[in-house]
C-alpha cells in the first residue's frame, strides 16, 4: 500500500503539517487583531470626541479626544467651525465643517473624514450658502447631514444622504433651522427644527422619507438642539433659551411622553451616550468657558471636563463592527 504524506503511520508528516496549519491560523488571527487595533488605535472604545469651535475663524477649530478618565488630547486641528461628529463602522470620524468664502461671502459645507490615525480627507462638499449642523449614520452605513439655507430668512434646511461610497442624494427637507439628528433602532430619523416665531419641533422621518411631527416645544422662547438615544429607546434633547442656567435636557419616551431629565444649563448643545448608559452633555456656557457634563443613568451629575472653548457636538468611540477595515 502506498501512503500519502498525511497518512504515514508514524505521524511525522501529520505533525509537520499540523504545525504549519497552526502557524497559519495564528498569523491570520494576529492580522485580524492588528487590523482591529489599527481601527481603534487613536480612538479607544469609550473615548469621547468633541468638536470645538475655537476662535471661529477658518481653520481655527479642533476635535478634542477625552479618555474615560477625562484626560484631554487634540485628535484633529485646522478645522473650520466644526459641528456634527459621528463614527462609521470602521472607526473613521466624520465631521461637518463650515468654511467662510470671503470672495462670495458665503459659508461652504465640507464633510471631513478623519481616519483613526488622524489623517484628514474631504468626503463630500455641499453647494450653496449653507451651514452644516448635525450628522448621523444609519444602520447600513449611510451618512445623513442637515444643513441650513443661509439665503432663506427662515433657515429652511435640507437633509442630505451619502452612501458609504460618497454618492449624494436629498433625503428630505424641513421648514426651519434643522439642528440635531439621531436614528432609533427601527431606522427612523429624528431631527430638531427651530423657527423664527413658531415653537420648535421634533420631526420623525420613516426610512422611506415620510415625515411626521413627533413633538412640539411648549416653550416658545427656547430652541431645541442636539439629540441622542439611550439603550432603552428614550430620546434626549438639549434646549437653549439664551438665559443663563435656564436651559434643560428633555427626555422623550418612545411614545412621545416628555419630561425634564436635567436642568440648570447654559446653552447646552451636543449629546452622546456611552455603552454604560452615561449621558455626556456639551455645555457651552461661554463665561466661564464651556464644559462637558456627565450624567449617570439615574441622573447623578458630575463635571467630566472643563475650561473648553466652545464645545459643540459629541461622539463616543464604540468598538468597531467586525468587518474588513478600509
Question: Model regions: which residues?
Answer:
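Short loop/turn segments immediately following the C-termini of beta-strands
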Residues: 53-55, 98-100, 148-150, 194-196, ...
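Boundary/junction segments of secreted and surface-exposed precursor proteins
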Residues: 41-52, 321-326
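Bacterial N-terminal signal peptides
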Residues: 26-37
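A short loop-to-beta-strand structural motif that recurs across blades of beta-propeller domains
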Residues: 61-64, 108-112, 157-160, 200-203, ...
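Conserved beta-propeller blade signature
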Residues: 47-51, 92-95, 142-145, 188-191, ...
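N-terminal secretory signal peptides that target proteins for export/translocation
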Residues: 1-22
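Beta-rich, blade/repeat-based domains predominating
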Residues: 44-45, 58-60, 78-90, 126-140, ...
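A short beta-strand motif characteristic of beta-propeller blades
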Residues: 71-77, 119-126, 167-173, 210-217, ...
